[in-house]
Design a protein with these regions (language model features):
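Secondary-structure boundary/capping motif
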Residues: 48-49, 139, 143, 205
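A short, glycine/small-residue-rich beta-strand->loop->alpha-helix junction that serves as a flexible
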Residues: 42-53
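Short, solvent-exposed loop/edge-beta patches enriched in aromatic
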Residues: 46-47, 59-69, 193, 216-218
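Short, hydrophobic/amphipathic alpha-helical patches that form generic packing surfaces
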Residues: 51-62, 208, 212
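Conserved N-terminal ligand/cofactor-binding loop architecture of enzyme catalytic domains
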Residues: 1-42, 59, 63-179, 225-266
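Conserved nucleotide-sugar donor-interacting segment of glycosyltransferase catalytic cores
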Residues: 181-236
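A generic secondary-structure micro-motif detector
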Residues: 46, 175, 198-200
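Short, well-ordered alpha-helical scaffold segments within catalytic/effector domains
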Residues: 54, 175-186
């Protein structure tokens, strides 16, 4: 009964959500046009981030004169899960309704075409033979892009296991699944006029679209309730501003440097 209630709650807006949608419709007046370039926004259910998502989407839409598409990063792992996402799209999943209120025009649910499945199998057969150690996995590249760290961490997170057995059937299935995501997003970003992308995380499978966007020199962002991070080929992760501290410190006035060093010694 609780599971049914939880599922139904995904379709019904509470008072605050309704108010937020009214606010968005007053503030944001998008003009979707599918002949325009695209900005992709990951459909994320984190309530705390939705306000920043709405303003970020509006800024990117205006900057690139683009249409906003939302997306889920993963290919649904079963027919049932894919059906659930289709039902959410058709009957008004509440998070999707919130996204539509600030301008998203379509929800992308990844799926693999016949040629994509052949490509996935070819890549899998080539890569699996080279993965002998966990370091091999962590350093795995596909299309010249580093994905091994994402595949590794996503396995541990998804299966809630402390380590990977590289010889297991479960790992082989997981690797094939992740290659499917990579093939889909590489094809989508390569063959559509995508101008920018916003993701919820820079780890796990969520980061696959951003890594591919970076490879095509497209701006990608992690948008949170407090921060927005620009991701690049050289800066794959959010929260890495500490790497700039030395250069920032060197550009400070001498008296500020002295005060800071003195304070640090206390």
């Amino acid at each position: 009964m609780n599971k049914i209630k939880k599922f139904l709650n995904k379709f019904y807006l509470d008072r605050n959500e309704k108010e937020f949608i009214r606010h968005n419709k007053k503030i944001f007046i998008p003009k979707p046009n599918r002949s325009k370039p695209l900005v992709l926004m990951e459909l994320n259910e984190s309530s705390a981030n939705l306000i920043s998502y709405s303003y970020m989407a509006s800024i990117l839409e205006k900057k690139y004169d683009a249409t906003i598409f939302s997306f889920i990063p993963n290919v649904p792992r079963s027919f049932f899960k894919k059906s659930m996402w289709e039902l959410r799209r058709i009957f008004g999943y509440k998070t999707l309704r919130i996204f539509k209120s600030f301008g998203t025009d379509r929800l992308i649910i990844p799926s693999l075409s016949g040629p994509m499945k052949i490509e996935v199998n070819d890549i899998f057969q080539k890569k699996i033979s080279f993965i002998k150690t966990k370091d091999d996995l962590e350093n795995l590249t596909i299309f010249g892009i580093l994905f091994g760290d994402l595949i590794y961490d996503y396995y541990l997170n998804y299966y809630k296991e402390p380590e990977i057995d590289l010889s297991s059937k479960k790992f082989r299935q997981h690797l094939r699944f992740c290659i499917g995501l990579i093939v889909f997003w590489n094809s989508y970003i390569k063959n559509n006029d995508v101008k920018a992308i916003s993701v919820s995380h820079t780890v796990y499978s969520n980061a696959i679209p951003s890594r591919i966007a970076n490879n095509y020199d497209l701006p990608s962002y992690q948008t949170t309730v407090e921060d927005i991070f620009l991701l690049t080929k050289d800066r794959l992760f959010a929260f890495t501003e500490f790497k700039d501290f030395r250069s920032v410190f060197q550009n400070l006035p001498a008296n500020i440097k002295r005060q800071g060093i003195s304070k640090a010694k206390e």
